[in-house]
Amino acid sequence: MSSFISAGTTRDTAESTIENNGFWPDIPPSDFRERHRLDSTITSARIEGALLAAMATVNRMLRHWQAEKVDAGYPTVDDIPVPVWQAPGVFLGLYLRAVFSTAHASLIERYADYDATNSARERGEQLADPADSYRRDAAWAISEIEGRPHSTVELI
């Protein structure tokens, strides 16, 4: 027995830009789809839900840094002066990396939900490592924004 599964390439509906808090930019789901090469096999609703949850997580983690910058007179991330050794737009780029990586990790963990067979369970186990890699990318991007090292080591 053989089967054919078509991978979609068109979007199922027009995706609305997800509004952010004013300090960080609004996020068009199409940017996430393009940067992470996600086609229409993942529905717009799933993409938007993952992005909204990721934005909430990353915004919460960066809330103190954001408050510090706003108090210093920078109402948006674009207003923050970039250190001379960094590329222009570095804070925005790192923020998008953190949000997109967090959202992608969430989506990867859900792929096994499509199929209750043994192959789905095996596929879910294989996808655990990429999800962890995306979470690590998000954590490192947040650390870079905050000016912290990527890891903390303690002597026991």
Regions found by a protein language model. Give the residues of each.
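Short loop/turn elements at secondary-structure junctions
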Residues: 90-156
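A general marker of short, structured functional hotspots
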Residues: 19-20, 28, 87, 91, ...
